[in-house]
UniProtKB/Swiss-Prot annotation:
Residue ranges of every copy of the BPL/LPL catalytic domain listed in the record: 31-206
Entry annotated with the keyword Signal: no
Organism annotation: Pseudomonas fluorescens (strain SBW25)
Subcellular location: Cytoplasm
Keyword Transferase: yes
Keywords from the named record: Acyltransferase, Cytoplasm, Transferase
Site for Lowers pKa of active site Cys, residues: 134
Catalytic activity: octanoyl-[ACP] + L-lysyl-[protein] = N(6)-octanoyl-L-lysyl-[protein] + holo-[ACP] + H(+)
Binding sites annotated in the UniProt record for substrate: 70-77, 137-139, 150-152
Major location (coarse): cytoplasm
One matching Pfam family: LplA-B_cat
Full protein name: Octanoyltransferase
Record family assignment: Belongs to the LipB family.
Note: In the reaction, the free carboxyl group of octanoic acid is attached via an amide linkage to the epsilon-amino group of a specific lysine residue of lipoyl domains of lipoate-dependent enzymes.
Length: 215
């Protein structure tokens, strides 16, 4: 396994093509395939996980709802939110699912600390929280020992659509974002800091930017 973790910077892309691409990547990767992390922003979309219940979709309105194959309940993605899809061979890395989730949470907590924001994880509700409000969501799927889906960090976005759902299945869960706690915020800088933290917490030595498309 390489000691270099590859990142793809996808910019802003619709959710479904990226989801289908990560499914293909996971289904077709061989034992020699290198791990990748895809960084992306999505146009407004609700995604409903495998445990999702219809009653948690309160008033989706004109925002599309996509039923997906990750764990967890419903969440929202939109512009100003940094999404990282972790396409990892967790068998080679030697991580259990709980260990991987803990590493993802630690990565986010340290990133937020670099902006002077104190955040914490909750043992019974995966994700990262600031003063009880959720700032980052996690959702994974493991197939053939490899992960896909990942994490979403609210950076500087319109949080109003979260009020149209029970985020992650919790009625009335308060949501927050980095720009509410630290200014000024540059999205590209947050992305760079996230990359560095993922390299550290996934036990890689270096990172590189991958070129080419995902389809």
């Amino acid at each position: 396994m390489s000691h270099v973790l590859g990142f793809r910077e996808l910019g802003r892309m619709d959710y479904e093509p990226v989801w289908h691409a990560m499914q293909r990547f996971t289904n077709e990767r061989g034992t020699s395939a290198e791990d990748e992390i895809w960084l992306v922003e999505h146009p407004p979309v609700f995604t409903q996980g495998q445990a999702g219940k219809a009653e948690h979709l309160l008033l989706p309105g004109d925002i599309p709802v996509v039923q997906v194959d990750r764990g967890g309940q419903v969440t929202y993605h939109g512009p100003g939110q940094l999404v990282a899809y972790l396409l990892l061979d967790v068998r080679k890395l030697g991580f259990g699912v709980r260990d991987l989730v803990s590493r993802m949470e630690a990565c986010l907590i340290e990133l937020l600390a670099s902006y002077g924001v104190t955040a914490a994880a909750k043992p019974d509700a995966p994700g990262v929280y600031v003063d009880g409000a959720k700032i980052a969501s996690l959702g994974l799927r493991i197939r053939h020992g490899c992960s896909f889906h990942g994490l979403a960090l609210n950076v500087d976005m319109d949080l109003a659509p979260f009020r149209r759902i029970n985020p992650c299945g919790y009625a009335g869960l308060a949501m927050t974002q980095l720009s509410d706690h630290a200014t000024p915020i540059k999205f590209a800088e947050v992305s760079a800091r996230l990359r560095a933290q993922l390299v550290k917490h996934l036990d890689y030595a270096e990172q590189t930017t991958l070129t080419g498309g995902i389809d």
